[in-house]
From Swiss-Prot:
This is Assembly factor cbp4. Belongs to the CBP4 family. Essential for the assembly of ubiquinol-cytochrome c reductase. It has a direct effect on the correct occurrence of the Rieske protein, core 4, core 5 and apocytochrome b. Residues 86-116 are annotated as: Disordered.
Amino acid sequence: MSRAGTWLKMLGAGIVICVGGPAFVQSIRPTDEELFKRYNPELQRRSLEEGDRRAQEFDDYVNRLKQWSKSDKSIWYAAQEQQEQKRSEAEALRNQAKDEARAQREEMRKELLGGK
């Protein structure tokens, strides 16, 4: 009987730990509203202002991950390719802006030289 009693005690203790532990954690964890109320007013205001922007950024990121996962390549390679593509586009825009500025300077020079 002592072995059966020991097993029953251990089974009971296991059930209390496996069920009671998560239930206890759930009961003491504050809700999002309680956490928000603990913020100071400036943080509350900033959180409200930036909440939509952050949610949109997260949605964009999740959509990019979904797009990358459709590729046959690894997500990391797809992300790297997209970064390289953005970098090359930014470089092309920079070069275009430089060319436009150079053309504008040349026009200004011609106007100044032609006006003298």
